[in-house]
Amino acid sequence: MILGVDVGGTFTDLFAWDGERIQTAKLPTTPDQSKAVLDGASELADKVDFFVHGTTAATNALLERTGAHTLLVTSPGFEDVIEIGRQDRPSLYDPSDERPEPLVQRTDRVSDPSSVDPGNYESVAISLLGSYHDPSGEHLFRAAINEASPATAVSVSSEMVAEFREFERTSTTVLNAYLTPVVADYLARLEAGVRSVGLADAVSVMRSSGGLID
């Protein structure tokens, strides 16, 4: 039995196929999205061999600005790069241009991680100049943060997108750090629920770029 589940902000859609028969279900999405998934799955099957899941949990958290409280650690003088952006933006000289607020507030951007307590944050983004070529500085900072606050999630730019151009690398790393705790918490609840009722041994998740991750 194959079960496919797509969770949106309004409805949760399920598709089950046993090799001969197709079954579908549609339920309102619940505040804890895993509940609607489990309720719908119980209508279609007791046990599945392959559980495929797609969700807008990350998209919703970004649009609603409900992601993790995030700290940005970057090189001295580059704390504002995520706010300044690049000079090729369409309205470079428009003083009335309105842009979204950065995901990390100015007071939460530092060049020295020892100056703050990482335990006060759910997640940390580390993006240093030149780390696409030499990531050792980012690795040292991550080790220090992991030692000081093991429960805090850490994203490093050299692993997110190992390319030059500090704005793109930093903004991508910040986005990953901002959303990781939200998605990780949701998937942990979902997998625990799936296993507790014996529905499946694991959940495979659709990537926005295509393919699956386990």
Put a short name on every predicted segment.
Residues 1-214:
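N-terminally biased helix-coil "hinge/interface" segments that flank
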